[in-house]
Amino acid sequence: VHHLAGELFKITFQLDMVHVPYKGVGAVIPDLIGGHIPMTFSSMPPSMPYVKTGRLRALAVTSTRRSWAAPDVPTMIAAGVPGFVATNWFAYFVPAGTPGTIVGKLNAEINRTLKLEDVKATLVELGLDTLGTTPEELGKFVREESEKFEKLIKLAGVKGAY
């Protein structure tokens, strides 16, 4: 998502900037702090310790709402970039064909756990916002995200190799 957020930024502002395809945030953060690159899109967990100590400055979050971990940081939309949403998300998946009773029980337990105050506090400290959903809502979200990023990948001319 980080690379695609950068491509969306380039396209949105019609910028002529070089995309440096780092393989992970482990090398990006030191290069950003060291002034070797001017900016990056990063997930919250690896960045927040540096934001909290003043070594990095968070300009905006790319979600639709402010982060619980950084409530003073505006969304890209609030910062004046309409429609700019590119979130890094985590979900639980099971094999296709898993019985609905098992899916329902797992979903209920995951949602119950996400509501526990100590779990919420730990996740917020890491820079993660929680949102429990139903399997149907997750399926719809995954389809929408896939369609959105497929369009962006084509528009940006992104090529990949494995």
State where each predicted segment sits.
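Conserved, function-defining micro-sites of small-solute handling proteins
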Residues: 1-162
